[in-house]
């Protein structure tokens, strides 16, 4: 029917509870999935989930190589849940601010384990385009939503949904968008509700650095390393491949003036240099 004898990625769909995850382990279903992979009918195994706790288990399984996961600035504030309806509630808890730690952990574990993320729900069902329905009280554009998703650690691609040709054009505009048009950071940093103050989102507003540091990448490696009791060897080696290290920071604080989230970058560079030893 598909006029092919193999599929690149075979998907295990909609595993949203830890109980469901445990049920499929060592099951006839999983035996079938592994058999398909052994026969080269599927080349890679993927899984979809809306729950970061389940997705983390998949990323650490050793056999799931790709995760289809819901990512946008609004959903990233939400704590782990088995109930997908919580994502589409009309009102968010007023205490929610910044990226939920479990979701941030997922993105970093995926990057560390070389598990790619394909994004779904990048527009939050269109809510982020309407300031009255957005939890931030401001609207974002499709280009800004796409850029947010693609700048999360481990994200490889995003799937967008369309009803009209104009909506397709709005998404394709990302290919030719300027940095200013992609800029989601200024919008959510200054939003009247649920701002991301104090959190590095790797947006790149800190550039350029007078010491030529890739600040966003250094921050990403620091976040990856501090997830573990000891710095993983792979993270250490990737950090050491950077042309300029955190120890070269001259603490001029020029980057901090540009950071829309008020991150204390010079302080983070000092901590990073101590952590990695350079």
Task: Go through the PLM ranges and name each one.
Residues 1-20:
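Active-site groove signature of glycoside hydrolases
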Residues 12, 163, 173, 223, ...:
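Short amphipathic alpha-helical surface patches that mediate protein-protein
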Residues 14-217, 227-241, 267:
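Beta/alpha (TIM)-barrel catalytic core signal, keyed to glycine-rich beta->alpha loops juxtaposed to Asp/Glu
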Residues 200-209, 249-255, 259:
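Short cysteine clusters
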Residues 210-226, 257, 261-275:
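Iron-sulfur (Fe-S) cluster-binding segments and ferredoxin-like electron-carrier domains
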Residues 240-254, 266, 278:
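Iron-sulfur-cluster electron-transfer modules
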